[in-house]
A protein has these predicted regions:
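Short, hinge-like loop/turn segments at secondary-structure boundaries
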Residues: 50-54, 103-105, 127-128
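A short acidic, glycine-rich active-site loop
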Residues: 53-68
Length: 143
């Protein structure tokens, strides 16, 4: 069975549902959880070019929001008695999820079916589609 479950969060309600499922599964089977938030490099570049924002300021704000999201997962894990490691990374979200899963030797990836932002609401989770295509381990998509 699974020993290391990677749960990817973007802070959306779908991610919260995926997190709940990952924690419950981990508790039931005695697995540990890796909580990952990816700062989308395209979001950073867009904020800098379109809004004239300072790159370091944008990155710091997104880092803080990402850390808050994974810290929430850590708290859920603590309450359930599930060990949780937290990570915030910057890059292309789908590729980063797959890369972190490989680097951390995750044997299951858990994700929400789509994010809450812009075009990802219109597409059935473009990040999820890419992860499903590229991942070398099972992927649980929570609706």
């Amino acid at each position: 069975m699974y020993k290391r479950i990677l749960v990817a969060t973007d802070g959306s309600s779908k991610s919260a549902m995926a997190t709940k499922s990952a924690i419950e599964l981990a508790k039931a089977i005695g697995a540990e959880v890796i909580a990952l938030n990816v700062i989308n490099e395209v979001t950073v570049a867009s904020a800098v070019s379109q809004l004239g924002s300072d790159r370091k300021d944008v990155e710091a704000r997104l880092q803080a929001a990402g850390q808050k999201a994974v810290d929430g997962i850590k708290s859920m894990g603590d309450a359930a008695g599930v060990p949780v490691t937290t990570m915030v990374r910057q890059g292309a979200p789908a590729q980063m999820v797959v890369d972190v899963a490989a680097a951390e030797k995750a044997d299951l990836i858990v994700m929400g079916s789509h994010g809450e932002s812009g075009m990802s609401k219109l597409l059935i989770g473009s990040v999820v589609q890419k992860v499903l295509y590229w991942a070398t381990v099972p992927v649980l998509v929570v609706r």
